[in-house]
Regions:
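Acetyl-CoA-dependent GNAT
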Residues: 2, 9-12, 16-68, 72-74, ...
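Alpha-helical hairpin
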Residues: 4-7, 80
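Short beta-strand element of the conserved SAM-dependent methyltransferase core
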Residues: 42-45, 133-138
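Conserved acetyl-CoA-binding loop-helix of GNAT-fold acetyltransferases
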Residues: 71, 77-90, 110, 114
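Conserved GNAT acetyl-CoA-binding A-motif
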Residues: 91-103
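Conserved catalytic-core motifs of GNAT/GCN5-like acyltransferases
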Residues: 98-100, 116-134
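Acidic helix N-cap motif at the loop->helix transition within catalytic regions
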Residues: 107
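Short, charged/polar, Gly/Pro-enriched secondary-structure boundary elements
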Residues: 140-142
Length: 142
């Protein structure tokens, strides 16, 4: 059974293990811990093990910005990122939700499109030669 919940400090090591798997180091440890402390980190679990996580904040022009959407490499293409996004569509503190990914990350672009996000713009010069594409969706009204 898959469930999505807010992360707690007890989850930090499992979350970091996934992040290290993906980026190769624990450079985001403090960022992730801070997100957990602010209740801005959610996890997707299946059979009591954490398969992915999402962090967000509301500092993007006052709107929710999904900053990290990370799924364990061996658990991808199974709907876990979509479960995290779906949770945010129901629980976002703001009506508008933004996120972004590199132009080279076609898999994440497909996830955004499959979840109803629209392309909203592009930022050059963050990663040399690999523009950042901004995506946007409006939270469904209750």
């Amino acid at each position: 059974l898959r469930n999505v919940t807010k992360a707690s400090n007890d989850n930090l090591d499992s979350i970091l293990h996934i992040d290290i798997d993906v980026i190769g180091d624990d450079s985001r440890r403090n960022y992730i811990k801070h997100a957990i402390d602010k209740e801005q980190c959610i996890i997707v679990k299946e059979d009591n093990s954490i398969l992915g996580f999402l962090t967000y904040d509301t500092n993007f022009f006052g709107y929710t910005f999904l900053s990290l959407i990370i799924v364990s490499p061996t658990k991808r293409r199974q709907g876990h990122a979509s479960s995290l996004i779906s949770y945010m569509l129901s629980n976002s503190p703001t009506q508008k939700i933004f996120s972004s990914t590199n132009e080279s990350n076609t898999n994440m672009q497909k996830v955004f499109k499959a979840n109803g996000f629209m392309r909203s713009g592009i930022i050059e010069n963050l990663d040399e030669g690999d523009p950042e594409i901004i995506f946007y969706i409006k939270k469904p009204r209750a």
